[in-house]
Amino acid sequence: MAIKIGITGPVGSIKAEALQKIIGMLQNDGLNVQGVLISKVSDDGKLTGYTIEDILTKKKVQFCDEKFVSRVKIDKLGVDTRLLEEILIPSLQKARESADVIIIDEVGKLENTTKKIHSEIEETLKCGKPLIVTLHKRSRNPVLQEIKSLEGVRVFDITPINKNILPFKVMHVLKGEE
């Protein structure tokens, strides 16, 4: 049974910082880490969009922007679903084939953008590989509820107090030491 880890926390960069640290630790252990990372784009402190990056290929595109006209929105910003699918779908397919550990950053924001993305994320959540997902802490989030219901899942809530120790705790869980 593959270990599934959910990292929840407040809006802000502490989840991203912890995730980057975990990815670095996994790669230092010689593991093949694949999946996607989401980053905020801001202008003078105002959120203006999001980028998605394939961890393996380093290909990165801005898929969400205040200037994009779209029915699909994330945080009231327009989403270019074609750009999102171009990175996310092949990244998760490849990760299911060849990764040692799969990462899906901000899964809650992404999951309901298109049916293709929803099914790709569902398939990845159920695959037999170790998986780390991050999402905003919202108890009514259906993705969080789904992740919690998966067999072998551990959910950690990151806070400013535990943000430095959490990556080590996640590593212990992935190694079966906890």
Swiss-Prot record:
Record carries keyword Nucleotide-binding: yes
Highest taxon above the source species: Archaea
Keyword Hydrolase found: yes
PANTHER family reported for this sequence: CANCER-RELATED NUCLEOSIDE-TRIPHOSPHATASE
InterPro entries, per database record: Nuc-triphosphatase_THEP1, P-loop_NTPase
HAMAP family, sorted: NTPase_1
Class of this enzyme: hydrolase
Record field: catalytic activity: a ribonucleoside 5'-triphosphate + H2O = a ribonucleoside 5'-diphosphate + phosphate + H(+)
Recorded GO MF terms: ATP binding; ribonucleoside triphosphate phosphatase activity
Biological role: Has nucleotide phosphatase activity towards ATP, GTP, CTP, TTP and UTP. May hydrolyze nucleoside diphosphates with lower efficiency.
EC number: 3.6.1.15
Sequence similarity: Belongs to the THEP1 NTPase family.
Binding site for ATP: 9-16, 101-108
Protein name: Nucleoside-triphosphatase THEP1
Organism annotation: Thermoplasma volcanium (strain ATCC 51530 / DSM 4299 / JCM 9571 / NBRC 15438 / GSS1)
Entry keyword set: ATP-binding, Hydrolase, Nucleotide-binding
CDD domains for the chain: RecA-like_Thep1 (cd19482)
One Pfam match: NTPase_1
